[in-house]
Amino acid sequence: MELSLKRPICFFDIESTGVNVVKDRIVEISILKIYPNGNRESRTWLVNPEMPIPPETTAIHGISDEKVANEPTFKQLAHRIHDMIKDADLAG
């Protein structure tokens, strides 16, 4: 598949503490940025959700409370994520 881009496009994937959009939080976010010239940039961040990760959720994605205990919160990462996606179209 060939893309004809006028702006960069960022594809993103998240892992979370669950599927409830009101109470659950992100524990990992990955972004792949593709530029119109074909260059690529990618980043993955672990995120401290500031709440326990249920064992049944850890069994799905493998991310435990211990793994994110010393990671930044989403609020602490938000500016870096914004810097990566600010000039791009988004795709999930």
Task: Name the predicted role of every residue range.
Residues M1-G92:
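Conserved non-catalytic scaffold segment of RNase H-like nuclease domains
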